[in-house]
Amino acid sequence: MNIRSLERAGRAGKQDGVAVSPGQEEEVQNCVSTHDSNWPVIKDHSVKLHRVSPLLLQCRITHSSRWIAQVLASELSLLAFILLVVMVFSKKWLCFERIRFYQHWTMNVTTKIYTSVHIMSLGLLHIYKSKSYSNSEWESFKLWTNHPAFGVAKITFCLALGLGIILTIWLHLPYIPGLQKLPFFGWIGTVMSFCEGAL
């Protein structure tokens, strides 16, 4: 016999004049009220379990356009940082042996052009290690390395390298659970990526 039938039997007993003890009536009412009050709690709990389902969250995250854009940004930042590191340690970034000129220059101008291209092809760590130059090439080399624009370029490159490290780490931090809830997390990454692109 379920709760509803007990309640109906109690009401029918009252109508038919059947004596029902106060204890039995109170027990039936308490049982009914407890069942009715617990039903929304169970319903809300099942809804919450449905909402917090790990499979559902994983499906929403992996198919979200925002998540895909974040993954692309982090991987592109990692690729750019790898290229910056290669440029630092490379000895020959440009293949200047295959350069051909369509206009004949004097030997002095041609030497300066080749020296300039060679300096641009060197990594940051190998600029001051090259000593296999003739006197004219060494003068052109020193002229390039002592130029103020070259110093500005070095500072800019070092800043871009430092920001590349920070931005690459920052864009990979959202893969750690709980860090996306931090305030202004996305805005800081956006500002750093803009600064790196400006450099």
UniProtKB/Swiss-Prot annotation:
Residues 1-25 are annotated as: Disordered. Residues 1-14 have a biased composition (Basic and acidic residues). Its main location: membrane. The chain crosses the membrane at residues 68-88, 109-128, 159-179. Keywords: Developmental protein, Differentiation, Membrane, Phosphoprotein, Spermatogenesis, Transmembrane, Transmembrane helix. One of its GO terms (cellular component) is membrane. One of its GO terms (biological process) is cell differentiation. It is a multi-pass membrane protein. It is found in: Membrane. The modification Phosphoserine is found at S53. Component of the outer dense fibers (ODF) of spermatozoa which could be involved in sperm tail structure, sperm movement and general organization of cellular cytoskeleton. This is Outer dense fiber protein 4.
